[in-house]
Amino acid sequence: MDIHVWLAYLLTAVVFSLAPGSGTVNSISNGLSYGTRHSLGAIIGLQIGLACHIVLVGIGIGALVAQSALAFTLIKWIGAAYLVWLGIQKWRDRAPLTATTTSHELSQAALLRKAVLINLTNPKSIVFLVALFPQFIDPTRDHWPQFLVLGITTVTIDAIVMFGYTALAAQLGRYIRSPNIMTRMNKLFGSMFMGCGMLLATAKA
């Protein structure tokens, strides 16, 4: 892969990761509630989900999902329902944690599993990657090395961006000591999760 092609994709990957979505909401919410270190599992989970999408695209299943109305709709509704459920749980959280408090509610493993499902049940990501990757792959060269470079770049950039969102939120959380404020923040992020779920429910392949 030529360096100028990779740099163009790098910029695209940054924009893709910075765009607000359920992963962003999850990262900021975790940063506020659990701090940066405890939220690392969630960041890894998001990347596992994203990597699964990339693999599916690479072996051709992603294209089938993008072209199959039934498969897309099924994954879409599962993802939408899961995000709404997460939003309800966040909204009902009456005992928020500050960024400096150790979580007694969700372990890193639990945060990881939640994050994997958030990304894994978002078919819009598959559709986007199916449309995006061919634009940067030279058909006259071996497919897999180029695909591997694009996949590693995508996951690396997204991990950095999600870490940044989490760390910034954790720093903000240090100044939020009031339980009332944290309860309101939980309601805000609960509403955002539900909003992401509703937006996903209206998505089309």
Swiss-Prot record:
Involved in positive regulation of motility and negative regulation of biofilm formation. One of its GO terms (cellular component) is plasma membrane. This is Uncharacterized membrane protein VC_0136. The chain crosses the membrane at residues 5-25, 41-61, 68-88, 117-137, 147-167. GO terms for molecular function: homoserine transmembrane transporter activity. GO terms for biological process: homoserine transport. It is found in: Cell inner membrane. It comes from Vibrio cholerae serotype O1 (strain ATCC 39315 / El Tor Inaba N16961). Belongs to the Rht family. Keywords: Cell inner membrane, Cell membrane, Membrane, Transmembrane, Transmembrane helix. The keyword Cell inner membrane applies. It is a multi-pass membrane protein. Disruption phenotype: Deletion mutant exhibits decreased motility. Mutation causes a slight decrease in flaA expression but does not affect flagellar morphology. Mutant has enhanced biofilm formation and vps gene expression. The keyword Transmembrane applies.
